[in-house]
Regions:
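Short, glycine/charge-rich beta-strand/loop segments that flank catalytic centers
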Residues: 62-72, 89-93
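Conserved Class I SAM-dependent methyltransferase catalytic core
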Residues: 42, 46, 120, 190-250
Length: 258
């Protein structure tokens, strides 16, 4: 398995100098300056500033939603999407960050779906305030994944998602880190049910050479095995990538159509 290591984003000392009023309340240490990245509010401030400074993107974060790691999402999209492609982002979330990266950084035409009403509205705000409404078409789903949401004759160079991965019986950790059941519960005994449906429904929508890319926590080995098997069942060539961002490890799984 290929391993990629990337930096967390920006040095705390650097953003403290530029945004002292925003960063100082998040500090747990002054010398050297450190942010408590286990605190959701501090994590939100940090990633909003990373998005602004590195991507030139302004993000509005929904107070109940998961806070995405900007650098890991950037690397994920760059590994899965090529410049100027047509992309489907399934479950874009309240920030629509993967769709925004694909559209703004790679010049892609993106169809982004979201089923949670509050997240859909927040994603719309982010698309508008970054002037990407001509490149991103936001679609409200009603619990469907791809079938019934995307026209049958619409095909893509890449289908991407940060899928839910917890089994149905697991209680989400939303009170501490944010995240609705839709963001966290992948369904079934393993938590892979959402991903398996996405692969089965998405494969027929891939152009030749098209890719399905999913990113999950590195420790979710059973989910990864289920995803890999499902991609192979759809005759996709599978690549697993270990992505290390700071102290966090994620697995990117890419299935490519021949």
């Amino acid at each position: 398995m290929k391993t990629i290591k990337i930096k967390e984003g920006l040095p705390i000392s650097e953003i403290l100098k530029k945004y002292p009023d925003l960063v100082r309340p998040c500090l747990i240490s002054q010398n050297p300056p450190k942010i408590d990245l286990k605190n959701r509010d501090a994590l939100a401030v940090y990633n909003k500033l990373v998005a602004r400074e590195i991507l030139g993107v302004e993000l509005s974060l929904h107070p109940k939603a998961l806070v995405p790691s900007i650098m890991s999402r950037l690397e994920f999209v760059k590994l899965t999407v090529k410049p100027h492609e047509t992309v489907l982002d399934v479950g874009t979330g309240s920030t629509a960050i993967c769709a925004i990266i694909a559209a703004k950084i790679l010049g892609a035409k993106v169809y982004a779906t979201e089923m949670v009403e509050e997240y859909y509205l927040n994603a719309h705000i982010n698309i508008i305030q970054n002037s990407l409404q001509d490149r991103i078409q936001l679609v409200k789903s009603s619990g469907q994944i791809i079938d019934g949401v995307i026209p049958e004759d619409l095909n893509f160079d890449a289908i991407i998602s940060t899928p839910p991965y917890l089994p149905s019986k697991v209680k989400p950790l939303g009170k501490k880190f944010g995240g609705s059941a839709e963001e966290l519960l992948g369904g079934g005994k393993t938590g892979a049910e959402f991903s398996l449906k996405l692969i089965k429904q998405g494969a027929p929508h891939l152009k030749r050479g098209g890719r399905i890319g999913l990113i999950i926590p590195m420790k979710k080995e059973t989910v990864a095995e289920c995803i890999t098997h499902a991609m192979k069942e759809e005759k996709l060539r599978v690549q697993n990538i270990r992505l290390i961002t700071g102290n966090r490890e994620r697995r990117i799984i890419i299935g490519k159509k021949n």
